[in-house]
C-alpha cells in the first residue's frame, strides 16, 4: 500500500474514533462511526486475497447494520425528546436499540458471529487493530449512556458473551480465532460491570488492550498463526517461549498476573451490589478460557514436537525484527497486580 494513502487511512480511523469519543451531538457520533468503518476496511484488505475480501465484506455488512440501528435509536430519541444532545437522558426504547447497536459493533453475544470469521481472514496486524482500537468508540458511547442502560439486557448479553467466548475457543487451533473468542469473553466482563461502575469498565478496557497488544506482538515476532507454528518458538527464541507462557496465563486470568486484576475487581463490585449469581456464573465459565490458554501454554512451552536438526539450530540466527517495544508491554501485562490498591481508590 502507498505510504501516503496508508497514513491518510490511519489518520481517518483515529479521527473517526476521536469524533465519536468527544462529540456532544448524536449526528456527529454517527458520522464518526461511519468514517471509522469506511477507513478500516482497506486496512482489513491490506493483504489482498479472497479470504480478506470475505472478511472485509462481513465486517462492512455487520457494522452497516449496527450503524442503521444507531440511527434508528437517534431518530426515536429525537421524536420523544426533541434533543440531539448526547448529554440528555435517552428514551427507554432508544436506549435498548442503541445498546443492541453497540453490542453488534463490539461483537457481544448474540451478535458475535462476525468476530472470529473476520479476525481469521485478515493479517495479525489488522487483527490487532480490529480487537483493540475498534472497541474504543462503541465502549465510549456505552459509557456515556450507562444511566439509561437496561440492566437485565446488558447482564444477559454479558453472561452469554463470557460463556460463548469460553466454549468457542475450546476446539480452535488457529491463534487468531482463539484471540477473537477471548475478545468476546473480555467484552462480556467489561459490559457486565458497566451499569454498576463504568470507571471499572475503563480500567478493564485498558488492561484488555494491553494484554491483547502484547499477545499479538508476540505472534507477529514469530509470524505464528496456528498452535503448531507457535510450538516452534523455542527453536527461534527460547526466552520468548517463557514470556509467551506467562502472557497466555495472564490472558486467561490466572492469579497473580495482571489479567486476574479486572476479574477480581468486577466480581468484588458486583457482590457489593448484592448480585452474586451473575459473577458466579461468569467466574465458572471463565475457567473455559483459562483451560484453552493453559492447553496452548502446554503445547507451546512444555512439550517438544518432533522436528529436524536444522529446526533446532534456528536460535543461532539473528532476529531482524525490533523487540525494544515488547519489554515494557510484557512487564505491564504480567506484573500489574501490585497496583490493585491504587486502582481500587479510583472507584
UniProtKB/Swiss-Prot annotation:
It is found in: Mitochondrion inner membrane. One of its GO terms (biological process) is mitochondrial electron transport, NADH to ubiquinone. Its main location: mitochondrion. Keywords: Electron transport, Membrane, Mitochondrion, Mitochondrion inner membrane, NAD, Respiratory chain, Translocase, Transmembrane, Transmembrane helix, Transport, Ubiquinone. It is an enzyme of class 7 (translocase). One of its GO terms (molecular function) is NADH dehydrogenase (ubiquinone) activity. It catalyses: a ubiquinone + NADH + 5 H(+)(in) = a ubiquinol + NAD(+) + 4 H(+)(out). One of its GO terms (cellular component) is mitochondrial inner membrane. InterPro entries: Complex_I_Subunit_2 (IPR050175), NADH_DH_su2_C (IPR010933), NADH_UbQ_OxRdtase_chain2 (IPR003917), ND/Mrp_TM (IPR001750). Its EC number is 7.1.1.2. Disulfide bonds: none annotated. The chain crosses the membrane at residues 1-21, 25-45, 59-79, 96-116, 122-142, 145-165, 178-198, 201-221, 237-257, 276-296, 326-346. It holds the Pfam family Proton_antipo_M. Core subunit of the mitochondrial membrane respiratory chain NADH dehydrogenase (Complex I) which catalyzes electron transfer from NADH through the respiratory chain, using ubiquinone as an electron acceptor. Essential for the catalytic activity and assembly of complex I. Core subunit of respiratory chain NADH dehydrogenase (Complex I) which is composed of 45 different subunits. Interacts with TMEM242. PANTHER family: NADH-UBIQUINONE OXIDOREDUCTASE CHAIN 2 (PTHR46552:SF1). Belongs to the complex I subunit 2 family. This is NADH-ubiquinone oxidoreductase chain 2. The gene is MT-ND2.
